[in-house]
A protein has these predicted regions:
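Residue-level recognition of the N-termini of beta-strands and the immediately preceding loop/turn
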Residues: 47, 73-75, 164-167
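Basic DNA-binding region of bZIP-type proteins
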Residues: 16, 99, 146
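Active-site catalytic pocket residues across diverse enzymes, especially alpha/beta-hydrolases
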Residues: 66-69, 94, 156, 185
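Conserved phosphate-donor/acceptor-positioning beta-strand/loop module used by diverse small-molecule
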Residues: 50-51, 69-93, 98-118
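Short, flexible, mixed-charge acidic loops at enzyme active sites
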Residues: 8-13, 113-121
């Protein structure tokens, strides 16, 4: 959502671009202003929030919004990947900026180096794909997000009272993580039993 605003040069996008480049977090109120209307549009369907909430205040605002809108939260997944693996993925990441398509030199390389497979246009490195920004983000994660995750770990799931709201899934590669994630999703969302990928 933030990257869409950055690509389209909106006011929020310009703010997000500065924040992303600095490796810091968007203000809580700004994030909820973006997320709230999107969730309201999806009230009758399934939805995934990736990377939100990241702070206690965001989690509290999200909780208040979901309660007011009668939208129960079904599942929170905490992906646990070693920091050195995340850094390596970031350093090897190349992006087709207009579409957001992402390539990785180790496990999803483009057919031709530096060229998008679909359009033939050049791939780019994001300005924030560097060790310094990664370090700031990891420090923020440990300082701000990890305590919130620990609180969510204790919360029951509103729709499945016998199940935890938060589930930890760990691994180093998507071929290890994906089957675990799919299993959790299919257990929690029975209507998605046939989903393969």
């Amino acid at each position: 959502m933030l990257r869409w605003h950055v690509r389209h040069g909106t006011e929020v996008g310009r703010e997000a671009d500065r924040v992303i480049r600095a490796g810091t977090l968007m203000p809580d109120t700004t994030m909820m202003r973006l997320v709230g209307p999107e969730l309201a549009k999806r009230r009758d369907g399934d939805w995934i929030l990736d990377g939100f909430p990241r702070t206690d205040a965001q989690a509290e605002r999200l909780h208040e919004f979901l309660e007011a809108e009668h939208l129960p939260l079904s599942l929170v997944v905490h992906l646990i990947v070693p920091e050195e693996v995340i850094l390596q993925r970031i350093l090897e990441r190349w992006t087709h900026m207009p579409s957001g398509r992402v390539y990785n030199l180790s496990f999803n390389p483009p057919k031709r180096a530096g060229i998008d497979d679909v359009t033939g246009e050049p791939l780019e490195k994001r300005d924030d794909d560097n060790p310094e920004t990664f370090k700031k983000r990891i420090d923020n994660f440990h300082r701000v997000t990890e305590p919130m995750i620990n609180l969510l770990r204790e919360a029951p799931c509103p729709l499945h009272p016998d199940s935890p709201l938060l589930v930890d899934i760990g691994g180093e590669t998507s071929d290890i993580i994906w089957p675990k994630l799919l299993d959790v999703i299919q257990q929690r969302f029975r209507h998605l039993q046939g989903v393969k990928s």
